[in-house]
């Protein structure tokens, strides 16, 4: 089973880059995951954008702390099994924290969305939530993937190793900076601390450069706007043995329309 994971899509530049990439390469993959919580001008996701992603070949959209920025998506999240928000939010919050779908070949595959607690808003324990959901989902499929939307690399490493051998793939999102620590852990789980961002490289993690510089210089509130130009797609491609649920290969992707795949 070959899985594509695309990092946090930031605004229209990120969406356009994703569309071009999928038009060229989506047939190479059995299952496609994107993180869409920054896809609507950097804050949240709309119904129109979610539908566009799915029409382009995305199988499931994961979320994070910006999942609720657009209120129109609330009911959509309740009714769809193809868009997720972090599972460790309080009981009664709209949406779903995990889903079990099928890849192109009919293999069952699950995605769990979780959010970290270090340097972020208080939520339920991601470790205990992960353990509960993994134990539940493993009764249905061994092919389990976790998107951990978190700030601290240490928290990501800890939860990745805590889950090692019980899931197929653990990857981080949120920082918008792709890390170079992809590997297969001791018990067969693919791991990377952060898959990176899909959007403009001209700003600061997807936001207009001048705005961010002014924020640092003055400490005054700024209106954040999405950066444009020199777009890139960051993510990973992963091969999973669908019979055992073990990761066989994990590879970073860094791609632009003008330059193609970068090493």
Per-region residue spans from a language model:
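Acidic, metal/ion-coordinating pockets
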Residues: 1-263
